Amino acid sequence: MEARTFWLLVVAVLALGSSSSTGQYVGLSANQCAVPAKDRVDCGYPEVTPEQCNNRGCCFDSSIHGVPWCFKPLQEAECTF
């Protein structure tokens, strides 16, 4: 019984670890992070990790060199009629 509990705990920890490392837009929609490179407003600091960036409520995308990788998301507009 103890071995089963141990393995369930290991699986749970691995699942939590892998889910946090794959998401670049934790708590944000992909649309909010679709900021053109020229319009990115820096939200981080040199050598910020994706996790640190996301913890600040910012987007992380390191695919374009020479622009901020950690940047402020777009504000989603609310539709009012």
Curated annotation (Swiss-Prot):
GO terms for cellular component: extracellular space; secretory granule. The keyword Cytoplasm applies. InterPro entries: P_trefoil_chordata (IPR017994), P_trefoil_CS (IPR017957), P_trefoil_dom (IPR000519), P_trefoil_dom_sf (IPR044913). It is found in: Secreted, Extracellular space, Extracellular matrix; Cytoplasm. Disulfide bonds join 33-59, 43-58, 53-70. Residues 31-74 form the P-type domain. Residues 1-23 form the signal peptide. GO terms for biological process: maintenance of gastrointestinal epithelium; regulation of glucose metabolic process. Pfam families: Trefoil (PF00088). The keyword Signal applies. Keywords: Cytoplasm, Disulfide bond, Extracellular matrix, Secreted, Signal. GO terms for molecular function: identical protein binding. Coiled coil: none annotated. Involved in the maintenance and repair of the intestinal mucosa. Promotes the mobility of epithelial cells in healing processes (motogen). Monomer. Homodimer; disulfide-linked. This is Trefoil factor 3. It comes from Bos taurus. The lineage of its organism: Eukaryota, Metazoa, Chordata, Craniata, Vertebrata. The gene is TFF3.
